[in-house]
Amino acid sequence: MPKVNSRSLRFTERHATKYAASLLFIGLSLPATALADERYDALIRQARSGDTAPVLAYLSQRRAQEGLSLQQRADYIQVAGWAGHDEEVVALWRADGAALQRDSASLATAARAYRNLKQWQPSLRLWRTALQLAPADGGLQRGYVMTLADAGQDAQAQTEAAKAEKLLEPATWYLTRAYVDQAAGRSWAALENATHARALAPSDTGIQAYYVTLLAANRVADPALRESQGLTLPPVQQRRLQADEAAELVRLSFIDARGEQERFVIADRALARYDQLLTQWRPLPEAQDSYQQARIDRLGALLARYRMADVVSEYQTLQAEGRTVPDYAQRWAASAYLYLQQPDKAQAIFGRLNAAAPQAVTAEDETDLFYAQAENERIDQAALLAQRVSQRYPYATRLYQLPTLAYNDDWLVGQSLLAQSRVYQRDLAEAERQLTHLARTAPGNQGLRISLASVYLARGWPRRAEEELKQVEGLEPRSLPLEIQQGYVAQGLQEWRQLDLLADDVIQRAPESVAAQQFERSRRIHHMSELRISGNQGIDSDGPVSGSHDFGIHAALYSPPIYDNWRLFTGWGFNTGQFDEGKGINRDLSAGAEWRSRDLWLEAEVANRNYGHGNELGLRLSSWYDLNDQWRLGGSVARLSAETPLRALTNGISANGGNLWLRWQQNESRELRASVAPSHFSDGNNRLEYGLEGRQRLLAGARYRLDMNLTLSGSRNSQENVPYYNPKRDFTLLPSLTLDHTLYRHYQTEWSQQFQAGAGSYWQRDYARKPITQLGYGQRVSWNGVLDAGVMLQFEKHPYDGKRERNIGVTFDLNYRF
């Protein structure tokens, strides 16, 4: 935002008719012969009243034709000075000054002209000569002081200004002090002195004008505009004051309001003010500079009002018109791009501006670039930036060279960015370590503890996150970031009523907030219907379990939540496969209800199964219970279990069964699951299956995850010689690796690929141990939080009854919310 250039608005001694002392000098300098000349006398009177052109034309013509007397030469210099013809004064002085009788008035005129032309040294020499002739002349001393200030000789200017106190009227002396301070960059001291001058001479319009100039220079824009109402200022200065007042509203609009209801009041005032100014200035050719500047500054008011599309539209219009958009307005445009989920454009602007002036970059500027890079999926660049920022700022700094140290807020910004970069890089353990250290050393910092709770939740510890947030709730109970994070934790804990209450409050209070919108979106998705589909298609397989040409599909449609905890569902399933004894087909139609509450999940299902031997009633009850953040106990019981092998169903054999399992999940990187599953077949066979599965993350980065999996499983059956695969005893050992690699990601849209490889062994009673080989490749797509779908091509060689069979097939799944 442009500042008022006080040096261009400074008052000078250019117009001598404003100063009584100068008029007295001129009157005394007129020779008797000139006074006797009536025409010449009339021209001089005209000049004194401000019309200098006639006498200047007369003297110029006479000088060219007849030459001028010494007194006329002195008059010529004086009147040219009145007219503000500084270059002409200097030329006349150089030509005739040496021949003239030295008087303080002529010397002052020449000194003033040199000063206006920024020729400081000749001006200072003339001021000193004039002061030697009239040391008690306050006007000369004042001119000398102001020229010293212009020349950058601040110390001497202050010394000479102190000497002038006894020579000048108090108001004039304070005004001189103000000029010296302003020239040296002490703008607030200048305003203080101008305030004293104004108090001493409230009716002096010159002092009032300079006071307004200093108010504007110090960005005290609204008082400056109000004080200017009684003055006759140049239109360009008046427009600048109006623009500054509107720009001040823009600056204030970014400051947190006292209450949430008032947060847009100032921004709306700024927009209304700009609408008025733009309408007023648009048709005026002489006001186009002010008009264009107002268009640029208005971008800030639009940004503060969260009219991001308007910010981008106006910014692009300015660019298309070839307008030069200053850096601060470009940052506004970049912020709007980031809000509108166009991080590539935001990163380009932030990166260019930060690189252009690295020494002027603030921690806030680097934070903007960090999030633009992160949201543009330039995670490695963002991590490097966070590392640099964390090392750039010291923990504490000295203020005003005092011996005590003050805490440095920028240091905390750098450390927070570093921790956030670990989250983006999926190094949650390091992010937790860093945030724990920061939060425990600053327990009263609610923001740090909210960030720590978010990492707890990402690591699979919603109860620990809930406890952390509860501890800091008393610091600022109505904090929006706190309520949003509490909402996500409630969702993780299946506290649906709490989720709705928090989401309602947050979106009502801050509908423009991106974080609030994302939270509300998550809540809306929770309240949608859900469609689940999974299936498989055999390509080249002839194993005894699934048969050849096998195909299966299962679908379930869940209703939106009912009374917070309930969902109804209906399902359909179809399986087919070709076996030696014929083609097997199974059709299922099911319906049921689901209950979800804190720590508990229950699902009950009634199904009609038709597998070629009439319609049969199937029942299932499944449940799990969370003991804490690490342990979960679950199980199910079923009549006509859906896990019954298709080959058994084809031969008219059904099974009842169940399972019991216990899962331990240390964090997002490590888990174990032990299970046992007994089954009773209608042919009298009793089967007991057991297993232990483990997963350990080996590597993780922003775009990849590598997990090692281990499967230990076995079974035993009470009968042999049955028409389905039924080993007396068997045992499987299968370690494998799974690599998940992100191909594309843009906010909630992601496309990834998966690689699987495993090699182990299989032992079956009465047969030799033989190897198992597994390979797989798949891809997944997730979109906007409502769609998640994947497909995988799998290859397996598995021994059955001592013979290794090859199985090639495709599995697929889809989850869609609507």
Locate each region found by the language model.
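Gram-negative bacterial Sec-dependent N-terminal signal peptides
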Residues: 1-35
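Short, low-complexity, charged/polar intrinsically disordered tails
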Residues: 4, 9, 62, 96-98
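N-terminal leader-region detector that preferentially activates on the first domain or presequence
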Residues: 27-30, 34, 79, 113, ...
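N-terminal leader/linker segments that initiate helical-solenoid repeat arrays
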Residues: 29-84, 90-93, 105, 240, ...
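Gram-negative and organellar
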Residues: 71, 75-78, 86, 91-93, ...
